[in-house]
């Protein structure tokens, strides 16, 4: 089993496929609660651990993966007392797989760096089916 603690926020079509692939490779994944339950429940059924807030996820994750639809969604999960930045461990890596706005990405990168972490912008290419077999373009 790999040693990194992976936190994942955003289990839509692409995110849930990415989590499934990580679980296929024996990564321990922590997922953040969401109102939409089917993909969260599927990840939990395969061994994922669920936490209520992005802050709690960050407190136990070496690598935090974000797969959300808009910059506003990313910012909402990153900032505030329940956000990733509030719980970020020193040296943690945050990777945003969305197509976020450049100004938002730069601002979050600075905030994560100030908290002792690293922020990577890594938009995805291809489909959820490619994610399931580990063939995304990142």
PLM features per residue range, with description:
Residues 37, 73, 127:
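Active-site loop signature of alpha/beta-hydrolase-fold enzymes
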Residues 30, 51, 94-95, 120, ...:
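Structural detector of well-ordered beta-strand residues that form the stable sheet scaffold
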């Amino acid at each position: 089993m790999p040693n990194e603690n992976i936190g994942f926020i955003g289990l839509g079509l692409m995110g849930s496929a990415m989590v499934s692939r990580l679980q296929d490779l024996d990564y321990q994944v922590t997922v953040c609660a969401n109102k939409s339950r089917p993909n969260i429940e599927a990840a939990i059924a395969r061994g994922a651990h669920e936490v209520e807030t992005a802050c709690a996820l960050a407190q136990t994750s070496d690598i935090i993966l974000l797969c959300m639809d808009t910059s506003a969604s990313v910012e909402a999960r990153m900032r505030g007392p329940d956000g990733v930045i509030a719980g970020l461990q020193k040296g943690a890596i945050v990777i945003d797989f969305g197509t976020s706005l450049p100004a938002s990405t730069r601002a979050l990168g600075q905030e994560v760096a100030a908290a002792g972490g690293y922020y990577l912008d890594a938009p995805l290419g291809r489909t959820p089916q490619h994610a399931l077999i580990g063939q995304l373009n990142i």
